[in-house]
Amino acid sequence: GSICLEPKVVGPCTAYLRRFYFDSETGKCTPFIYGGCEGNGNNFETLRACRAICRA
């Protein structure tokens, strides 16, 4: 889906949440640290969810 093409957004908050995003350049779901607010749809709690939605 199109959310998989959105850029990784850490956001301005300071929570330290391990999430995954689909990297459209590599075609893989990649871990990143999410701040907890103002993210976008390319933000998954599990690698499995990222792969399922973005077909990585």
Swiss-Prot record:
Disulphide bridges: C4-C54, C13-C37, C29-C50
Annotated compartments: Secreted; Nematocyst
GO molecular function, one term: ion channel regulator activity
CDD domains, sorted: Kunitz_SHPI
Domain (BPTI/Kunitz inhibitor) ranges: 4-54
Domain of life of the native organism: Eukaryota
Site description Reactive bond for trypsin, residues in chain: T14, A15
GO CC annotation: extracellular space; nematocyst
Tagged with keyword Disulfide bond: yes
InterPro entries registered for this protein in UniProt: Kunitz_BPTI (IPR002223), Kunitz_BPTI_sf (IPR036880), Prtase_inh_Kunz-CS (IPR020901), TFPI/VKTCI-like (IPR050098)
Keyword Mitochondrion in annotation: no
Keywords, sorted A to Z: Disulfide bond, Ion channel impairing toxin, Nematocyst, Protease inhibitor, Secreted, Serine protease inhibitor, Toxin
Coiled-coil regions listed in the entry: none
Pfam families: Kunitz_BPTI
Miscellaneous remark of the record: Negative results: has no activity on Kv1.1/KCNA1, Kv1.2/KCNA2, Kv1.3/KCNA3, Kv1.4/KCNA4, Kv1.5/KCNA5, Kv1.6/KCNA6, Shaker, Kv11.1/KCNH2/ERG1 potassium channels and on TRPV1, the capsaicin receptors. A synonymy between H.magnifica and R.crispa is controversial.
Record's function text: This recombinant serine protease inhibitor inhibits trypsin (Ki=210 nM). In contrast to other sea anemone serine protease inhibitors, it does not significantly blocks histamine influence on intracellular calcium concentration in murine bone marrow-derived macrophages (tested at 1 and 10 uM). In vitro, it shows cytoprotective activity in the oxidative stress agent 6-hydroxydopamine (6-OHDA)-induced neurotoxicity model. In this model, it decreases reactive oxygen species (ROS) levels, and increases cell viability in a correlated manner.
Family: Belongs to the venom Kunitz-type family. Sea anemone type 2 potassium channel toxin subfamily.
Protein name (record): PI-stichotoxin-Hcr2m
